[in-house]
Amino acid sequence: MRTLYVHIGTPKTATTSIQMFCVENQKVLNKQSYSYPLLDFVYPHVAHRRNGHFLVGWVYKPGGQEDVEKEQELWEKGLAMIHQEFEKYDNVILSDENIWHSSNGRKFPFWAKLMQDAKEHDYQVKVIVYILSLIHI
């Protein structure tokens, strides 16, 4: 079954290194039927390698108000990207450190929306999370 891997980076667990590895090794991943797609749109102050940011990203209007319509537009573009990648690869990997932070906040409903999309488009979702042992802090 096609699988969407969602890497939710907890603090100090090498999320940036994992993202950079995936970007730099795209050809190797592709040969194994994995894709780490880069979005064709960007969020201000968010590194391009954070391809899962559309799941929880905030967008603001020039006056500082949240732009819910734009957030929905980017959500739909991000899902369309996943669907396109599944036409070529069996596995798609997304990663963003804000997913961890947003899982307890106002953006939490994205999980239900993502699971609904997975059901409608016949893929499964697996979450990857690394936890840093407190003894190392």
What do these predicted regions represent?
Residues K126-V129:
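Extended amphipathic ligand-handling, pore-lining, and cofactor/metal-binding catalytic surfaces
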